[in-house]
């Protein structure tokens, strides 16, 4: 099995230079990098992660707990995380918890055993029990992303869901809608509480009220939006516009409405939330609330790497500011 000395000899460089090239820890001339990587490939060299971690007290790995990796919103944010980790020479261990407490505990224990250098947490389902377990790991640098609970011991990214809910509802009101319903996520989740608070704030500012029958509790999945729309269409007094708390529910709502022969936006207007890539290509293209997902992913890693370098760094809070992306799914009355 090839060693770092073999690579250095073949590339005509020092072992220190080989280490810097492989770990991306210092600038090395492009021509030198090319020789090193050619030697690595020719010798099929794989550095020992165990030896490196013992020598440097670092594994160059980051763990990530995420609720649902298959949801487009999470997938796009994770792309930003993974891409920036790779550029910085870190390997990402992504753990899809699916909201299961036992899986969350198992993955957290596994990541601790792997001696990851830091942890990103993007779980809406963090309960007090798991949060307490996270806070026991005071030596582990950690960034709470998106919907996670607040903690004085971790850096945090805030998505300003209340502001987003307000902007979405205000946009519908500005287009003449006074009969507005919404398809929410689980109402016990912090992000849903914030978005519906923004929804009611916009209505209140316009001296409007919402029929409680027009508030449909979903779960951020397509099937819940489809069932909600089915209930809505059976009502005699229907809203003229729906605010869906994420884009995939909005797209499901549009599909269900169109299957009944009604038109979006001529008969019912729809606004979504997240601005996933697919939303621009649906029919009609979806008006939605934009969140800079890939940039947030990159920022989360930047904050975490700062924390890894300096565990006593002042706590950082990064705020996202949502904005309306106007397309074709909202009709002006």
From Swiss-Prot:
SMART domains: HTH_LACI. GO terms for biological process: negative regulation of DNA-templated transcription; purine nucleotide biosynthetic process. It comes from the Bacteria. Residues 4-23, 48-56 bind DNA. InterPro entries: HTH_LacI, LacI/GalR-like_sensor, Lambda_DNA-bd_dom_sf, Peripla_BP_I, Tscrpt_reg_HTH_PurR. The keyword NAD does not apply. Hypoxanthine binds at residues 73, 189, 191, 220, 274. PROSITE patterns: HTH_LACI_1, HTH_LACI_2. The keyword Amino-acid biosynthesis does not apply. Pathway: Purine metabolism; purine nucleotide biosynthesis [regulation]. Residues 2-56 form the HTH lacI-type domain. GO terms for molecular function: DNA-binding transcription factor activity; transcription cis-regulatory region binding. Keywords: DNA-binding, Purine biosynthesis, Repressor, Transcription, Transcription regulation. Homodimer. Consists of two structural and functional domains: an N-terminal DNA-binding domain, approximately the first 60 residues, and a larger C-terminal domain, approximately 280 residues, which imparts the function of corepressor binding and oligomerization. Is the main repressor of the genes involved in the de novo synthesis of purine nucleotides, regulating purB, purC, purEK, purF, purHD, purL, purMN and guaBA expression. PurR is allosterically activated to bind its cognate DNA by binding the purine corepressors, hypoxanthine or guanine, thereby effecting transcription repression. This is HTH-type transcriptional repressor PurR. It comes from Aliivibrio salmonicida (strain LFI1238). The gene is purR.
